[in-house]
């Protein structure tokens, strides 16, 4: 069962991840440190060298935003977590109001739990095996936390229009 998803919120959350990344990796914030730790030097590279990673980031950010909206919808929208509903309950699902505070709180908590259990855990595992500097791992994991928190806030303040 697919819960109601506010695709405008998903698009806004996707764009928010791009803004967070642009600020985080700017030279005045963490960009210089990140370039030093990774050895990446963007100067002199063709434009396509940045376009492809940005397009990939946009796509996976959309997937992440949609996935969080789906999880939060399954948890908070009445009826979406119980597939054995009868017809009357299904109808009630579509007219039942969404508790906006619960939706927001669930979005934030779910985002942080999913970040810790999937994003941070996987980053740390891969970086440990690849021998990446701990400072780089921390920089990237904290960036992902900030990104997920902002994304979760956007999803959380803009629930589906079932209310």
Language-model features and meaning:
Residues 1-163:
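Juxtamembrane/disordered regions of integral membrane proteins
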